[in-house]
């Protein structure tokens, strides 16, 4: 009898250990959630001036600094780093005040600089990180989930619209599915040109092709389950695939104050 109880307890604790998040604390993203609901419009355009004056956003950034991410479940960590990328990017726009694009070089009309993304200016989880650090060294390397490319927002009109809700441990998988499907069926994600028998797809599938190939064997096979029936049917005719020009224009509702 004692042996059966011991075995049962061992099984019980083993199951609990394997279930994601049983012992993990969820990080509080409610302040960021409220900011997104208040300052992002239905098109995903951002009121950077309003966010810059919002105390809740400042408090959220502070909370990211000493976060113990290792105590979160895998989904909790994924949600944390997506939100951290988006929050850091928003704050960099507020601090840098680009006029038309985060890739401005100082030469009118020339948008080629990557310094905005590569310069580590924020403390997140006790590390000084840049947006590129979060994207390439953490999200891509650790999670190997190409859907993150439709969740992290580069403050530009070519990237997916910034959602009006923060990611959480509970919603991250559902939200990733929704954002991927939404982007791929928008004009930013895919466009059909029947006269040229060409499907134009987002430049994201060129830049990060290895991520999609690793996941699904090819970029098209990754896309297929998310596409509307019209686009899937067009793909059956084996059209030419070309890439859309990426729009690096700032995703701001209005010019930033203090420019």
Predicted regions and their residues:
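Interaction/scaffold regions that mediate signaling and macromolecular assembly across diverse proteins
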Residues: 26-259
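Bacterial N-terminal signal peptides
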Residues: 8-21
């Amino acid at each position: 009898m004692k042996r059966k109880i011991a075995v049962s307890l061992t099984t019980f604790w083993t199951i609990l250990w394997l279930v994601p998040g049983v012992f993990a604390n969820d990080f509080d993203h409610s302040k960021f959630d409220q900011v997104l609901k208040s300052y992002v419009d239905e098109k995903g355009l951002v009121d950077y001036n309003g966010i810059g004056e919002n105390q809740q956003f400042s408090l959220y950034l502070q909370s990211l600094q000493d976060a113990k991410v290792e105590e979160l479940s895998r989904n909790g960590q994924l949600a944390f780093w997506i939100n951290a990328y988006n929050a850091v990017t928003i704050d960099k726009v507020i601090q840098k005040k680009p006029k038309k694009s985060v890739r401005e070089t100082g030469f009118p009309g020339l948008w080629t600089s990557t310094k905005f993304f590569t310069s580590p200016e924020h403390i997140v989880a006790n590390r000084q990180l840049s947006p590129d650090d979060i994207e390439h060294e953490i999200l891509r390397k650790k999670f190997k989930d190409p859907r993150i490319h439709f969740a992290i927002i580069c403050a530009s009109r070519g990237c997916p619209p910034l959602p009006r809700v923060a990611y959480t441990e509970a919603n991250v998988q559902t939200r990733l599915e929704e954002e991927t499907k939404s982007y791929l069926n928008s004009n930013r994600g895919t466009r059909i040109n029947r006269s040229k028998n060409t499907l134009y797809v987002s430049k994201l599938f060129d830049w990060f092709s290895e991520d999609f190939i690793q996941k699904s064997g090819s970029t098209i096979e990754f896309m297929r389950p998310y596409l509307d029936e019209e686009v899937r049917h067009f793909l059956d005719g084996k059209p030419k695939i070309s890439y859309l020009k990426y729009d690096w224009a700032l995703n701001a509702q209005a010019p930033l104050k203090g420019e």
